[in-house]
Amino acid sequence: MVRRFALPAAVILALAAGAPGPLSARTSVTVQEALLRAKPAVVLVIAEVSAEVTLDCGGGPTTVTPPVFRETGTGWFVDGRGWIITNGHVVQPAHTPPRWLVNQQAQRAVTTACLAKVLQRQGITPGERPDVEDAVKRRLLDAVLPTTKVKLNPQVSVVISSGARFKAEVKKYSPPVSNEPGVMSGRDLALLLIPGAEFPVLPLADSKVGRIGDPIHILGFPGVVLSHELLNKSASVEASVTNGAVSGFKQDVTNQPVIQTDAPAAWGNSGGPAVDQKGAVLGVLTFVSLAPGPEGSIVQGFNFVIPSDAVREFVKDTEVKIEGKSKFTEAWFRGLREFFTEDWKAAARHFEAADKLVPNLPDVKRILGDARENIKNPPPRPFPWFWVAVWVTLLSGAGYGGQFGLRWHRNRYRIQPSEVIRMLEAGKAPIVLDVRRTEVYEALPLKIPNSVRLAPEELASGVSGLELDTNRPVVAYCT
């Protein structure tokens, strides 16, 4: 009996293990869900430095405002109360403006205010005589720059994916890694704070448990997308995603650990989160690899990430709470969970709550629309092969069980020939009743010694006067 039912039972257990039930749905996260968890918490970081340059081109002091210096990078909410992590080098031009930036703004001002006037006096149109123009420009810079005064107005801003822009305050700063003598080298992290009390947030993963080959996804705002002439303005507020794997564990020039990945990255991705397969931050993109030569193009496949454990260490003496929780995130994660288990109504309720907390996030709007559409027009459900397999297995098991029960009922008093032999060997010879049908008994020469002949007809009509030793077992031979 055990052998007969072993196969159906095993099949049922295997099918049940693969069944789409509440427990399995709650413990697994698809790549799509993981990335949607992360995207709303990723922000564009802008470091801007405007300048007021006072100079004298020969006609008295004048104030010039050269074009604003601007660099962009990526950041992400580590605390839903407005705390953002990015790279130190992303905000460095605005946080600690370097000397070269002061000189650059001064030179731009001199070129803008003075060069055209001098060329005009010499009867030269700008661009007409490049060689003469370059010589005049060099003389002007030598003459005007020493008395030029530059006032810088640095500012760091953050743009969330709804397009809302916030002025950010740098609350903690660690300079970028450097191998130049005399240049301070740090962890290349910066902690920003923007006004507001409710934002998306990303949880931190444990970077120590990462292994080579683990999937990794980099989110950010690469400049090639921000400046793409064929994309509209929405590209500047929605994070792009690249995918790869952990490809190594290295140390930078100051012996600090970094994670190597082959996930593609570009200028503008700096400071962006590198998330794992559950959407938690495994690290922060910090630097890429450049080809040798003056152009120094990026060599993809060799990018590096600051481990999340370094982020924990960086913010431990601040007001940041590393909980990975906010009201928005709770509603957003629940909505995604319900959406991917096809509970469209519950998903829509959570998405609506998330949209009220942080309005107009593109991913929220998009998936809320999908949930509402699925409520109105439910998508076709796949054929329930799982339950068909379960029922077929159960019916097969019932059939096997019925056959076994019938056979057991018929044979419940049957004794095997080996049992008879054991009785004979043990000196407990049974009384053998030969109850074969008459035609079989007469046709076959086999006769059992010392047996008692009893035809089936006699059994049917009732037997009287049959004397048997009641202390001996009785075996009926019918085949």
What does each of the following model-derived ranges do?
Residues 380-443:
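Flexible, polar/low-complexity N-terminal or interdomain linker segments that lie immediately upstream
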Residues 88, 92, 99, 105-107, ...:
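C-terminal subregion of chymotrypsin/trypsin-like serine protease catalytic domains
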Residues 33, 101-197:
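Conserved catalytic-core segment of clan PA serine endopeptidases
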Residues 463-479:
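Catalytic cysteine-centered active loop of the rhodanese-like fold, especially the PTP/DSP P-loop
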Residues 76-77, 211-212, 264-285:
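Catalytic nucleophile loop of clan PA
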Residues 362-386:
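Short, aromatic-rich amphipathic segments at membrane interfaces
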Residues 23-83, 87, 95, 186-190:
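N-terminal activation segment of mature serine protease catalytic domains
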Residues 70, 158-185, 201-259, 266, ...:
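Flexible, gly/ser-rich surface segments that form the specificity/activation loops bordering the active-site cleft
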